Amino acid sequence: MKGSVLKKFLCTCLVTAAAFAATTISASACTTIYVGGDLVEEGTPFVARTEDYGSDYNKLWFISESGKWKQGDHYVGCPEYGPFEWDFTHDSYRFTYFTNDIYYDGICPECGEKADHYSYTEFGTNEKGVSVSATETLYGNEKVTEADPYRDAEWAEANKSERIGIEETDIPTIILAEASSAREGVKLLLDIYENYGCVYASGVFICDKDEVWYIENCSGTQYVAIKLNDNMIFLEPNMAVIGRVDLDDENVIASKDL
């Protein structure tokens, strides 16, 4: 019965994603999927994300070897977005990641520069068993973003700030290089949101063998993180799905000014 439920659900997902892709032209188009472990035949949670584009956005898998960045090394993200900067707290963990197949000879297709940063990193798993699925672009309410603007290059210039917020494509690199558990990865990302903010809103999964967390931020520094249970399903096509939550629940972490 569980297998039948999942097959029907995945069939619906494929039809929905195909319909959504058919109406999408040159836009951020992704669909995030979560199926709790109780609804999966193998008994483990199912986390996925489709990119609803044509074949020119096929993916290439890579491995970032352990120690690529040493403790104290300075990371500079893609100049196209600011860029975000980070000093590694320890030698980086080994992790897998994938990028678009338009990444040639070390040239980043986003900024056109030959740089050390990874181009549009979306998903990966590190040697500690931590997985991150990111780049589910969201859109914040204009009234909210006026009160808590995105910490992008324009904001940094207007506020004379030397740092900008994290861009969604840098999230997998930083979390997978640094975090030894899902909980540690969640704390790190939320600390970054609080201290540096974000360039744009997004939805992010951070999980390991024990926990699956889903984080949404729809303005510069505000966020909600929820530890997902095993009896739920959700499908998210570039839209925030977290609604009313109990901020006192031990499975919910929210920014203090939310």
Q: Which role fits each region the language model picked out?
A:
Residues 172-178:
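Short, well-ordered beta-strand elements within core beta-sheets of diverse protein domains
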Residues 30-167, 188-258:
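A contiguous strand-loop segment
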Residues 169-170, 183:
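A structural signal for well-ordered alpha-helical segments within the folded catalytic domains
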Residues 1-6:
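N-terminal secretory signal peptides that target proteins for export/translocation
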Residues 7-18:
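Sec-dependent N-terminal signal peptides
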Residues 19-27:
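C-terminal segment of classical bacterial N-terminal signal peptides
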Residues 178-184:
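Short, charged, surface-exposed loops that flank catalytic or proteolytic processing sites
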